[in-house]
């Protein structure tokens, strides 16, 4: 089964920005209700896109530098990053099919 990647301030450059695959990064926090609702969806997406895209989660409380760098104000916010650049952004606990559609636009 696919597992989402735990993104951090330390590994963001090498694992996310330098990745040759499209990366979905879910910015979340443990105190955020909608983030918790989105959690299982992110895990399902990690399964669905195993080998095709990287699905990552970044805890904004533990990794304030990256969250600040991308101006993340409300969570959950999801960024799709490809070739080191943000190519898409979604805010809120969206349904899985909407998120998947966005990822699909940036794969391949």
Swiss-Prot record:
Function: Participates in various redox reactions through the reversible oxidation of its active center dithiol to a disulfide and catalyzes dithiol-disulfide exchange reactions.
InterPro entries: Thioredoxin (IPR005746), Thioredoxin-like_sf (IPR036249), Thioredoxin_CS (IPR017937), Thioredoxin_domain (IPR013766)
Disulfide feature: 32-35
Species for this entry: Chlorobaculum thiosulfatiphilum (Chlorobium limicola f.sp. thiosulfatophilum)
Protein name: Thioredoxin
Keyword Transit peptide tagged: no
Bilayer-spanning residue ranges: none
Family: Belongs to the thioredoxin family.
């Amino acid at each position: 089964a696919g597992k989402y990647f735990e993104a951090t301030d330390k590994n963001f450059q090498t694992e996310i920005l330098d990745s040759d695959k499209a990366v979905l990064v879910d910015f979340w926090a443990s105190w955020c209700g909608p983030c918790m609702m989105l959690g299982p969806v992110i895990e399902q997406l990690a399964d669905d896109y195993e080998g095709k895209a990287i699905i990552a989660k970044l805890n904004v409380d533990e990794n304030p530098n990256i969250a600040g760098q991308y101006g993340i104000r409300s969570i959950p916010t999801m960024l799709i990053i490809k070739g080191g650049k943000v190519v898409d952004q979604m805010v809120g606990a969206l349904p899985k099919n909407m998120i998947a559609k966005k990822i699909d636009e940036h794969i391949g």
